[in-house]
């Protein structure tokens, strides 16, 4: 059984609230989970202390047992210094504007 630390959505329509849970990776996103280890409220300001609340001791225990955090949860854990901060993804060069688009931008601006 592969165990993940991930977000489980709650709240109302257009008012999301997430629980940070430890769950079987094959279980539905909002379905059965093993343990709730924190909360994430994206509706409060970034610097608010209740935006991300973590039970650090329980998370450390699950990480020691081999639970894998999802990308978003890994960022939360990195900011809390529970794991090394994951590397930010660089924008690939192929998505940069091509020569013709750059010429148009120079002409317009």
From Swiss-Prot:
**Does the keyword section mention Ribosomal protein?**
yes
Question: Where is the segment annotated Disordered?
Answer: 87-109
Ranges of biased composition (kind: Basic and acidic residues):
100-109
Q: Which UniProt keywords apply?
A: Ribonucleoprotein, Ribosomal protein
Would you name any one GO CC term?
Answer: small ribosomal subunit
Q: Name one GO biological process term.
A: translation
- Keyword check for Ribosomal protein: yes
Q: Which family does it belong to?
A: Belongs to the bacterial ribosomal protein bS16 family.
Q: What name appears for this protein in its UniProt entry?
A: Small ribosomal subunit protein bS16
Organism classification = Bacteria, Pseudomonadati, Pseudomonadota, Alphaproteobacteria, Rhodospirillales
